[in-house]
Amino acid sequence: MRRRVLLILATMGLEVLLLGGVALADTIDGTSGPDDLVGTDQEDVIHASGGADYVSGLAGPDVLYAGAGNDTVVGREGNDSIYGNTGSDTLFGNESNDTINSAGDGVKDVVKCGIGKNDTAYVDKIDWVKENCENVFLLVRSGGA
């Protein structure tokens, strides 16, 4: 009975928070499976983990990290920083001036900066970069001994 009451009170508190229209900045961590991770209208930090994840920052200058799976990461509004990871990721900057880094994993990623006027992408030679990225830097690895 006590557990049920606590659950009801927690649900009521969440409803009050949502009805108040308050969106607080957040740090969100994914699980080892596939996740849909969506931020707030404030500045968020979102870390995907394992699985094929979907990450969206919404408004605000967000920092978004793809995880180990084949992830889709969407910046939305705000000057976002987006980082790919192992796996074949699809990274979208969307609105504002974004920085996207898919370099260093050696796996083909798709990078689309968006409608900002000063987007920057750091990529590998194998990555597919859409034409809307204004500043593109190619990671070149030197040969080892």
What are these regions (language model features)?
Residues G30-G33, G39, A48-G50, G57, ...:
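Glycine-centered beta-turn/loop sites at beta-strand termini
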Residues M1-L9:
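Bacterial N-terminal signal peptides that target proteins for export
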Residues L9-L18:
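Bacterial N-terminal signal peptides
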Residues L6, G20-G21:
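Alpha-helical hydrophobic membrane-insertion segments
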Residues G21-T27:
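Sec/Tat signal peptide C-region and signal peptidase I cleavage site
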Residues S102-G144:
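Leucine-rich solenoid repeat scaffolds
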Residues A25, E43, A52, C133-E134:
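Short, well-ordered alpha-helix to beta-strand connector turns
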